[in-house]
């Protein structure tokens, strides 16, 4: 463990963030997960509030540095009276046994993030700004599959992705895998992600990313790397 921690510190020191070549991916930072009043697949309310607060702080700094954000928002259409979510065999099976994907909280697969529902709205505290893009063609765990995300990133000359959002162990980790496969530097911002599935899978996923294919940094660490330096000292 000491060897792994030493390696992680060295890797974190080597990571440089060039605002001109960096983008934020805000993955499913919508009301369907993060607004306890209407969420259809809710993160626990206290955790949701922490993720929103940390993410708002991150975006304030990245936006000031000229870094754009892509908002990936899950959308599901109703086809023949049934959510297209239920074309997936596993999700259909969970729906059939009326099981909840969220420990200790009710959730609905068939009613999750239907097109034009309020659940598909980005949390107001994280609202898109000029130069940002909202991608609504996300229908599964992947932020890249059948979307124009990669095209947008390539057009910007992006090399590094700051990943935030829900869920750490599904959509966020999937984005980190796919970013790595496309030769982006994947950085998961640890206090800007969490999971409706529970802390065990959240923690496992952060460890998996950090040890295998990307960086895991806190908001403070990211801000520190974006802060201009004078004489080698952050100002």
Language-model-detected regions and their locations in the chain:
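Active-site-adjacent betaalpha module
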Residues: 1-23, 60, 64-65, 88-235
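A short alpha/beta connector and helix-capping loop motif
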Residues: 20, 38-62, 66-73
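Acidic-leg catalytic submotif of subtilisin-like serine proteases
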Residues: 23-33
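Short beta-strand segments at enzyme active-site cores
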Residues: 27, 67-76, 80, 189
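Surface-exposed cleft-lining segments at the edges of enzyme active sites
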Residues: 33, 40-47, 109, 161-162
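Catalytic P-loop NTPase motifs of RecA-like helicase/translocase cores
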Residues: 33-34, 196
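Surface-exposed, active-site-proximal loop segments in enzymatic domains
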Residues: 36-43, 84-86, 179
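Short, well-ordered beta-to-alpha junction loops that form the rim of enzyme active sites
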Residues: 72-75, 82, 138, 166
């Amino acid at each position: 463990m000491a060897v792994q921690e030493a390696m992680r510190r060295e890797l974190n020191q080597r990571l440089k963030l060039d605002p001109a070549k960096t983008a934020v991916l805000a993955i499913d930072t919508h009301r369907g997960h993060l607004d306890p009043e209407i969420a259809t697949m809710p993160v626990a309310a206290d955790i949701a509030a922490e993720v929103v607060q940390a993410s708002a702080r991150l975006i304030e700094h990245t936006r000031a540095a000229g870094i754009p954000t892509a908002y990936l928002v899950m959308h599901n259409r109703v086809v023949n009276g049934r959510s297209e979510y239920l074309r997936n065999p596993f999700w259909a099976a969970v729906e059939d046994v009326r099981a909840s994907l969220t420990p200790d909280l009710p959730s609905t697969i068939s009613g999750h993030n239907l097109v034009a529902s309020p659940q598909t709205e980005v949390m107001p505290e994280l609202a898109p700004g000029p130069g940002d893009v909202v991608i609504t063609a996300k229908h599964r765990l992947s932020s890249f599959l059948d979307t124009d995300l990669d095209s947008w990133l390539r057009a910007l000359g992006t090399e590094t992705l700051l990943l935030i959002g829900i869920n750490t162990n599904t959509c966020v980790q999937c984005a980190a895998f796919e970013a790595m496969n496309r030769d982006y530097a994947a950085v998961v911002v640890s206090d800007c992600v969490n999971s409706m599935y529970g802390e065990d899978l959240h923690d496992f996923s952060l460890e998996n990313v950090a040890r295998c294919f990307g960086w895991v940094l806190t908001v403070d660490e990211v801000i520190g790397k974006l802060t201009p330096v004078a004489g080698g000292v952050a100002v």
